[in-house]
Amino acid sequence: YYDAVDSLLTAMKDTTDKWVVRDSLVALSRRFGQVLTPKVQDVKIVTADFLIQNIDSAFVQWREGPWARHLDFEDFCEYLLPYKVEELQPLDDWRTHLRSFHPDHLDELAYCDLYRNSALQAGIKLNDNLWYYMKPGITDETIQLPVYRWRTRLRLPIGTCADYGNIATSVFRSQGIPVVMDFTPQWAFRSLGHSWNVLLAEDGKRMPFSGVCSNPGQPHKLGERMPKV
């Protein structure tokens, strides 16, 4: 299925209307979606070596990386440590794979005393790179059979807020930038809900943003009425 998606995206790479591409992806996923794949609980397949590798990698980013040193242990466990971002995510070495995504742009921050340890500035630069690379198109309609293979997923021209939020969370954590997902299941005045990211800045502020689409520090959905809690 993933190879078929890659082939479709390559064949339609010159198509300027991404919604035409979306319709083709939806049709393709429906065709493959008739094939049911078994779901297995993590506890039955996850290995000690996989968990140890994940813990070691996250711990090095926390203690030795430039953008997570301000986290206490509780925040580290929530914002950086988790071995996966979403359900059905392949249990592979995603941190190492995604760490190579535009690393040179982040390295530039090391030359500025004000920004070299700024999780906020690192997040802005990385999110800008994601936007430039993916050219996101927000849609409420998700494809029937999701794409989880990273080299294919980063090529998709459309996605839901949750799709882009999960992508951003994974890429940010791979670089040692502390980020989580948040959501509201239902808007107060219309159908559907919304998902977004939250970055824990070096000054302790929790800054909402839309992964791939809008940066931390920018106004986020100020025109939307919030439901009562």
Where are each of the predicted segments found?
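Secondary-structure boundary elements
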Residues: 1-156
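Hydrophobic/aromatic-rich core segments of domains that either
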Residues: 112-129, 138-151, 157, 162-229
